[in-house]
Every structure is written in structure tokens, then in C-alpha cells.
């Protein structure tokens, strides 16, 4: 499967205590399509009252929602990053369009201290 930055995929994402994992959506944030491993950020349908500065809320009303392939309103948690083998990706759901990618980049920059 050819993967690019901005692809929204399903992956087994580990719990923070590493006791187990659950198949969840994530967005690819790494840029090298030839790499064996990809860096992903966690996506959750458990919505915060107020999103953190490192989170982006995407709702079904948003013009970018359909292309994402997500089924529910979701929060992109750009501070929850993980490098995984691309072979662990279950399937691609959709892709962040340019507008959504720009929003995610702002949150990612804040998450890693570049903004």
C-alpha cells in the first residue's frame, strides 16, 4: 500500500501503558513514502470539552470531513505520536485534504515545540 503524509488509516494503536492495543484511526505525519516505518498521530471519537492547542476537532459539518473517511466527529491528537511499521496498517480510510493538513500541521508544530 502506498502511503503518504495526510493519509488517514486504521492501525493497532497501543494504550499508553503498553498493556494492550486497539484498532483505531490515525493520520500519517511522516513524509517519506519509501520508509518502512511511518509516524502517526492518534485520532479519537471521544471529544474533549475544549480541544487542547495540540488537538484539532473535525466534525461531520466540516467541509473536510467526507474526504477523511471517518464515520464520527473526531479529534486529531497531534501530541500522541507513534512510529510503527507500515505493515501494521489495516487499511486506508481517507486522506486529509490541503486545508485539513494545514490545520493539523499547526497543531503538530505546537505539539513538538516548533510553534
Language-model regions, residue ranges each:
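Conserved functional hotspots at enzyme active or ligand-binding sites that engage polyanionic ligands
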Residues: 1-115
Amino acid at each position: 500500500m502506498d502511503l503518504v503524509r495526510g493519509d488517514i488509516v486504521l492501525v493497532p494503536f497501543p494504550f499508553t501503558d503498553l498493556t494492550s492495543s486497539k484498532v483505531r484511526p490515525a493520520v500519517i505525519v511522516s513524509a517519506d513514502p519509501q520508509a518502512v516505518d511511518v509516524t502517526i498521530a492518534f485520532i479519537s471519537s471521544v471529544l474533549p470539552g475544549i480541544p487542547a492547542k495540540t488537538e484539532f476537532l473535525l466534525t461531520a459539518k466540516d467541509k473536510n470531513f467526507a474526504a477523511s473517511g471517518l464515520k464520527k466527529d473526531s479529534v486529531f491528537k497531534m501530541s500522541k505520536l507513534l512510529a510503527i511499521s507500515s505493515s501494521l496498517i489495516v487499511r486506508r480510510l481517507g486522506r486529509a485534504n490541503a486545508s485539513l493538513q494545514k490545520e493539523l500541521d499547526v497543531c503538530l508544530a505546537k505539539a513538538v515545540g516548533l510553534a
